[in-house]
Amino acid sequence: MNNRKLSFALALILSLSAMSCGSGGDVIGGETTTSEGGETTPEVTTPAEINRENAVIGLPELDFKGETINILYAGEKTYAQDVTAEETGDVVDDAVVARNRSVEELLKVKLNPIVFSDNTKETAEHLAKVILAGEDLYDLASVHQSYSKAYVSEGYYHNFANDQYIDFDKPWWNNEYMEEMVVGSERKFFLIGDISLMYLKSLGCIYYNKELYESIYKNPDEPYDLVFDGKWTFEKFDELTRGAYSDLNGDGTVDKADQFGAFGSKNKSVEHFVYGAGIRSTTKNKDGIPELTLYNEKTVSFAELLHKLYYENQGFLIAPNNQFTEELPMFQNGQVLFAPTWLRYADTFRDMKTDYGIVCMPKFLESDEYSTLVHDGTTVFVAPTTSKKTDMIGAVCEAFAFYNYKSVTPAYYEVALKVKYSRDDATAQMLDLIHSSAFTNFGYVYASQLDGLTSVREFVVNGAEDFASWYKSKESAALAGLAEVIETYKGIDG
């Protein structure tokens, strides 16, 4: 282990130990003042905004007498880090190991990670079969969002909404996300936020090659300035992408030997462009029931821009798949300016010889807020209703999320950007912006049940130009699918 990694690991262990010792709850200090009459009164202080430096866990002192918590997870490493790792000298692996030790010491429990399969779909299906059989094999599970959502209507997952140990107001939870995933209110079957490292890896973002940007547009930090000044719009992205194109081989045709501004697929990339621009396909009413709201003036206008990017911008390279097997090396080699992907691809860029930056997905209008769609390949944490340890699972989840927020997330940032996380650093501020704007939408989560309308993929796949006609052709099936999903939720207890 080199000195930098050793220093990080030692600092991490010491900080986690200190956090464990100070787990009696949040304390806001205040000075006392003495009046002329000799009476002392406490001076009222405004609570500081919670951040990664000052956050403390609010759990009471708990002792679960060494109880074992069985946690199911998918064995593929990208997903496994949610639950377990080995000390390898890698800052993220070591942070995960330190987190697990801290959770065990804090709550007096024994964490028992169990892998059934490396495959995320097989893992979700296995969990469902175990619950259906009434077997108490697992207390907690890290499962793929897209593959696990179907089983919530079967009543397989515990509702954490009123858990005595989880404080959903803390920044390590994405409360709105959890509420958006279900029908109704006061239902939290899926836990997500910093508890899931895969959630962080699944945040949509755009990498850019700083050296190439400087050679074309002079200022390599301009994308950061555009974001922070509120001017990072989809039209600006389209403009910069178009301007970056160059016919490198001089053959007069657009081919992969040329220089491009950006790349994207016709499916997953489309979803991140659409939802990142602030489009929402469904909206919850006052009772928490989702209603189809995709068709409006904003969506129609954005669809026109999306079509222009994919079919009228020679600087945009359409990728044949979501793995970007040819396009990622082109970005690394300085042949593509922007790489709209997910944060998880930072691992791929670790050995790039040139510097890269990272910005959020562009918004539609300057007046909009930035939005970061979480890819549905993220993991969510669920507790099987067959577990008899629901009294302690919430405490374990709260501790998991807290320690991730304090240490594992910053460790991943260090890997992602090759710099130590600092609140004063522009890249750290960008990551905080991406993290704080993370969301999902019910229509996105259940797009397959809504005839694919709410993913907007087919609009781009078919090369359609008239969004209104395309929408009308799918609206009836989407409404029927939405009604069916809503109906299935009515039979769920909790």
Model-derived features with residue positions:
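Acidic, glycine-anchored loop motifs typical of Ca2+
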Residues: 247-258
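Conserved C-terminal helix/tail region of periplasmic/extracytoplasmic solute-binding proteins
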Residues: 385-394, 404-494
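Short, solvent-exposed loop/beta-turn-alpha elements that line the ligand-binding surface or hinge
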Residues: 166-173, 227-229, 255, 279-299, ...
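Extracytoplasmic/periplasmic substrate-recognition and gating elements
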Residues: 350-417
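Glycine-centered hinge/linker elements that transmit conformational signals in sensory
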Residues: 238-243, 272-276, 280-321
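Conserved N-terminal structural module of periplasmic/extracytoplasmic solute-binding proteins
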Residues: 2-154, 407, 464-494
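Hinge/lid segment of periplasmic solute-binding proteins
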Residues: 49-67, 117-121, 145-203
